């Protein structure tokens, strides 16, 4: 495993205020731990916008962007998704997801 990765996954979104508690519980208790269990994911951090939006940002450092093509990631983001994940993701608004590679 490398000391730092060459890939970043950034995900931004808004959630209606009445769903924020559930969203934050899901992110902290289920989603980030699931992602961090995937080989090649190195760090996962969450941020809240001080102003502007989208309000929520998650940044995942990966060994490389190719991790997103791995069977483990494809399973976790496909048929391995929980009902809770489907529910929370279905409430997301202004969803932005970008993958970056170090230059």
How would you label these PLM feature ranges?
Residues 1-103:
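Macromolecular interaction modules
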């Amino acid at each position: 495993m490398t000391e730092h990765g060459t890939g970043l996954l950034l995900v931004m979104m808004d959630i209606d205020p009445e769903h924020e508690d559930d969203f934050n519980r899901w992110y902290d208790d289920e989603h980030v731990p699931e992602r961090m269990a995937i080989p090649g994911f190195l760090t996962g951090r969450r941020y809240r916008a001080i102003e502007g939006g989208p309000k929520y940002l998650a940044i995942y450092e990966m060994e490389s962007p190719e991790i997103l093509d791995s069977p483990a990631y494809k399973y976790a983001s496909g048929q391995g998704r929980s009902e809770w994940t489907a529910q929370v993701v279905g409430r997301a608004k202004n969803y932005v997801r970008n993958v970056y590679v170090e230059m």
